[in-house]
């Protein structure tokens, strides 16, 4: 917190300005801070909102008192929604919603690479961003996710019309979903589309006197030719294989687009077994946990432990990629404890931990303990769970159930069990 050192304005609000970048940190770093130091996360969120108030837009990246490059969506919206649904107090969420709505409605002009939503006019008119605008693919996907974040805050503040509008808009990722495209045994991918709605099998990266300027685009296309900046790709730092599985706010909708549970499970297996999963970057962070939505949380745990064993160690190069302001190490920390957040929502997925016991010492003076019984390399499957002495059948736990204190006990065994077939129930007693 650099309050008092800010040369641009003086007030009593916290001032954090080293965000590098929220695209990296919103998935794991921010949720971990919320869990272990909620006062700090409250100040960070207040700072984001105050930057909007004083400087015009919340940042995606910021350093040296200036908003920097946007990478995907206007991801500060997810940070605000995450704080809101987890009940962090002392934040002006009405003003926060104003900041979110400015991102979602006001074009940032020639600052579109530094703040706000680039390609916003097309997104609002077409429901997607057409190829030719940098990062059209992941911007469409992430704006949809950010719209869900807006809907969540609007609903909590009693703004029903806004809630319905942005909930509907959060489905815009489907407008780039090409149902008939097949690759490596999977069908349906997020792929380039032009302004007229045509799907593009061939794309132009730019003009060159050396190389052919038109290339076939496939779900494994990751980089362009040498003369193309990496930030001008259809997806930012990822492939369609990765982003077509990165719909954290609507996993049931994703499963439906993939052809149902059986085909989705087969697709996940192809994703991991064929090497399309990228351990060293953020777009795939949630993917190992997607088996939870198939009533098979034990398969999520198997994937997670395999990934950690192959890619993490305690040597000088112990992380598989850039830590990105704690994003990579926070992913590991959560999985060592047996929890994993779905940012912008109020729950954590439960997996087999690597640690026999974890104790959270909460701000309210209480503690929350995660304990295991019989955990070993052989006994790696959860057989049953109790929360504060009561049978707990769900494979996720709400934030409020952690911060009120208590104990989650995981009984382990050698074989997969029937535990955890239900993720959680929402307010309408429907499956998440």
Which stretches of residues belong to each language-model region?
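Short alpha-helical segments and helix-capping/turn motifs at coil-helix boundaries
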Residues: 13, 27-30, 63-67, 82, ...
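Mobile, glycine-rich extracellular loop/lid and propeptide segments
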Residues: 26-29, 41-51, 64-72, 83-86, ...
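Primarily short, surface-exposed interaction patches in extracytoplasmic proteins
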Residues: 48-54, 58, 63, 154
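Active-site core of glycosidic bond-cleaving carbohydrate-active enzymes
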Residues: 15-27, 36, 73, 77, ...
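Conserved oxyanion/phosphate-binding beta-strand-loop segments in alpha/beta enzyme cores
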Residues: 1-16
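Active-site rim segments in enzyme catalytic domains, especially the processed small/beta chain
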Residues: 43-46, 55-59, 75-78
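Short, solvent-exposed loop/turn and secondary-structure capping segments
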Residues: 1, 31-34, 42-45, 59-60, ...
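Beta-rich accessory regions
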Residues: 350-432
């Amino acid at each position: 917190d650099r309050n008092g050192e800010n040369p641009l304005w003086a007030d009593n609000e916290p001032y954090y300005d080293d965000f590098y970048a929220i695209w990296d940190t919103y998935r794991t770093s921010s949720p971990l801070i919320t869990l272990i130091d909620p006062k700090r996360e409250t100040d960070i969120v207040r700072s984001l909102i105050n930057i909007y108030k004083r400087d015009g837009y919340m940042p995606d990246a910021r350093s040296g008192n200036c908003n920097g490059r946007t990478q995907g969506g206007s991801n500060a919206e997810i940070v605000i929604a995450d704080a809101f649904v987890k009940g962090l107090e002392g934040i002006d969420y009405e003003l926060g919603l104003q900041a979110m709505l400015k991102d979602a409605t006001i074009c940032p002009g020639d600052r579109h690479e530094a703040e706000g939503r680039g390609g916003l006019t097309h997104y609002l008119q077409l429901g997607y961003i057409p190829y030719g605008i940098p990062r059209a693919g992941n911007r469409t996907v992430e704006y949809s996710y950010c719209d869900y974040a807006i809907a969540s805050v609007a609903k909590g503040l009693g703004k029903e019309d806004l809630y319905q509008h942005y909930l509907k808009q959060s489905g815009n990722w489907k407008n780039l979903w090409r149902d008939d495209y097949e690759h490596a045994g999977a069908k349906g991918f997020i792929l380039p589309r032009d302004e007229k709605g045509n799907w593009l099998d061939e794309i132009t990266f730019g003009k060159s006197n050396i190389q052919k300027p038109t290339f076939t685009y496939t779900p494994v296309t990751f980089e362009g030719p040498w003369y193309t900046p990496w930030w001008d790709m259809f997806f930012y730092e990822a492939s369609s294989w990765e982003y077509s599985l990165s719909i954290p706010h609507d996993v049931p909708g994703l499963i439906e687009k993939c052809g149902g549970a059986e085909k989705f499970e087969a697709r996940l297996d192809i994703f991991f077994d064929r090497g399309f999963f990228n351990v060293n970057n953020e777009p795939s962070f949630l993917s190992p946990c997607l088996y939870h939505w198939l009533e098979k949380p034990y398969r999520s745990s198997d994937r997670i432990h395999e990934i950690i064993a192959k890619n993490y160690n305690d040597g000088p190069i112990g992380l598989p990629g850039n830590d990105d302001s704690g994003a990579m190490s926070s992913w590991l920390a959560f999985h060592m404890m047996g929890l994993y957040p779905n940012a912008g929502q109020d729950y954590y997925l439960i997996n087999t931990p690597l640690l026999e016991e974890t104790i959270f010492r909460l701000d309210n003076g209480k503690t929350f303990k995660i304990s295991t019984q019989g955990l070993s390399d052989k006994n790696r499957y959860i057989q049953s769970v109790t929360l504060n002495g009561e049978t707990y059948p769900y494979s996720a736990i709400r934030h409020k159930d952690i911060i009120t204190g208590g104990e989650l006990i995981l009984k382990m065994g050698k074989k997969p069990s029937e535990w955890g077939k239900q993720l959680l129930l929402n307010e309408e007693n429907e499956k998440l």
